């Protein structure tokens, strides 16, 4: 398997793990917020505001995973080293 194939595979696995964690975290946050509003409807404004801030923090994990995956795919700092190594091995 080539270096670039490994980069694509690593980026795909990294993005999958990042979004899986984000989805689970957001689901648990919304579940807790809905339970809190059902117990105390008067505090729904504060609960929803806190939930939205929490969801933004949770979503940042997926954004960071996406940025790292894009760096791996398009701006890989090891690309030149891998190409030189491949040329050396081919000789």
From Swiss-Prot:
It comes from Pelobacter propionicus (strain DSM 2379 / NBRC 103807 / OttBd1). InterPro entries: ATP_synth_csu_bac/chlpt (IPR005953), ATP_synth_F0_csu (IPR000454), ATP_synth_F0_csu_DDCD_BS (IPR020537), ATPase_proteolipid_c-like_dom (IPR002379), F/V-ATP_Csub_sf (IPR035921). Pfam families: ATP-synt_C. The chain crosses the membrane at residues 4-24, 53-73. F-type ATPases have 2 components, F(1) - the catalytic core - and F(0) - the membrane proton channel. F(1) has five subunits: alpha(3), beta(3), gamma(1), delta(1), epsilon(1). F(0) has three main subunits: a(1), b(2) and c(10-14). The alpha and beta chains form an alternating ring which encloses part of the gamma chain. F(1) is attached to F(0) by a central stalk formed by the gamma and epsilon chains, while a peripheral stalk is formed by the delta and b chains. Belongs to the ATPase C chain family. GO terms for cellular component: plasma membrane; proton-transporting ATP synthase complex; proton-transporting two-sector ATPase complex, proton-transporting domain. PANTHER family: ATP SYNTHASE LIPID-BINDING PROTEIN, MITOCHONDRIAL, ATPASE PROTEIN 9. One of its GO terms (molecular function) is lipid binding. The keyword Repressor does not apply. It is found in: Cell inner membrane. The record marks 59 as: Reversibly protonated during proton transport. It is a multi-pass membrane protein. Its main location: membrane. NCBIfam families: ATP_synt_c. This is ATP synthase subunit c 2. Keywords: ATP synthesis, Cell inner membrane, Cell membrane, CF(0), Hydrogen ion transport, Ion transport, Lipid-binding, Membrane, Transmembrane, Transmembrane helix, Transport. F(1)F(0) ATP synthase produces ATP from ADP in the presence of a proton or sodium gradient. F-type ATPases consist of two structural domains, F(1) containing the extramembraneous catalytic core and F(0) containing the membrane proton channel, linked together by a central stalk and a peripheral stalk. During catalysis, ATP synthesis in the catalytic domain of F(1) is coupled via a rotary mechanism of the central stalk subunits to proton translocation. Signal peptide: none annotated.
């Amino acid at each position: 398997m080539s270096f670039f194939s490994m980069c694509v595979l690593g980026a795909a696995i990294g993005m999958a793990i990042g979004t899986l964690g984000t989805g689970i975290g957001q689901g648990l946050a919304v579940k807790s917020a809905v339970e809190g509003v059902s117990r105390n409807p008067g505090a729904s404004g504060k609960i929803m505001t806190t939930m939205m801030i929490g969801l933004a923090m949770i979503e940042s994990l997926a954004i960071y995973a996406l940025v790292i995956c894009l760096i791996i795919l398009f701006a890989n700092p090891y690309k030149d080293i891998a190409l030189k190594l491949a040329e050396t091995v081919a000789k």
